[in-house]
Amino acid sequence: MKWSTKQRYRTYDSYSENDLESLHKLALKSPWKSNFHIEPETGLLNDPNGFSYFNGKWHLFYQHFPFGPVHGLKSWVHLVSDDLVHFEKTGLVLYPDTKYDNAGAYSGSALAFENSLFLIYTGNHRGKDWVRTPYQLGAKVDKNNQLVKFTEPLIFPDFSQTTDHFRDPQIFSFQGQIYCLIGAQSSQKNGIIKLYKAIENNLTDWKDLGNLDFSKEKMGYMIECPNLIFVNGRSVLVFCPQGLDKSIVKYDNIYPNMYVIADDFTTGSKNQLKNAGQLINLDEGFDCYATQSFNAPDGSAYAISWLGLPETSYPTDKYNVQGVLSMVKKLSIKDNKLYQYPVEKMKELRQKEQNLLLADNNIITSNSYELEVDFRQQNSTLLSLMTNEKGDSALKVEIDKENN
């Protein structure tokens, strides 16, 4: 089904109870329901947002269009967790219900500040001429998970510097100062990251510090979802450069999710990642995008990704549902590369162990399992997973020890 702009931007209150019931019934018929991953009950899930720790709980939000597997009028769903494995949904909490976000509550981030969880997100406004104006908006979540929006934008767009592609604010604290990164397209149609600081850490008063300097390469035509985190004493920038030239880094997705590791983050006369290394793919898989990462109160760094891509269709679409989030990944640096590991609590999901030898030609009929592979002799090994009966369709993974 092709969705028109009018259908995508219907207001939420225009849907009846019967509409919602029909959506749920169809989604329940999907054979693609996951066992471990966060997914929507109906409609579209895309970017993870507001990943944070507050009031003794892990908090996570995701962008949501409840009414179909398309990018329509976005809102945020809120979840909380005690262990980063089991998440409990509190509900849809951030609606596109003001003049500043009447065309969608887009991506953003969160920071525990004083006695609340502070949210900053992009609100898309469209008028009768359908011209987009992106505002960076604020909200607070209290200890009872009640959300209240700020009435006025925190950061206004400056169209002398950027186009209307100006979104995905990431708020973070560094050396006692609160900063914000925003992905953008420059007025020259290049991908850039804008840097702001909260004046005297007042979260309603922001100063534009200019662009973040982290590479001499051209970063495509737009940067989405920038995140700056601190891992093992290094500064790590995770971001999504749309239109990146593949001569810079090879990638197979429509849009890549990249990272760079630097020695330090500095501001002042120059806003830069000092001695930033090469761009590296965050994930070599087919569907990993819009990764959101943050530093927990103890300094540990965690990340979670959308397992999906814009402008892509999936088998679940026929059931009016699309998108899941990755499992939470704990981050570390080894040999100047970013390593991503499942959190320790994932081990508690393990059940019966089964040892398989290639010589036995074992067949696993379940699609829910953890696979550990031990190969001692070969320099290269090819695994075929989820192979069909004919053997002509599979997920093939090549492990090359020599080239790592």
Task: List PLM regions with ranges.
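Beta-rich carbohydrate-recognition and catalytic domains
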Residues: 1-103, 107, 111-168, 173-219, ...
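Short, surface-exposed beta-strand/loop micro-motifs that present aromatic residues
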Residues: 49, 291-293
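Repeated scaffold domains used in trafficking and secretory/extracellular systems
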Residues: 224-226, 289-291
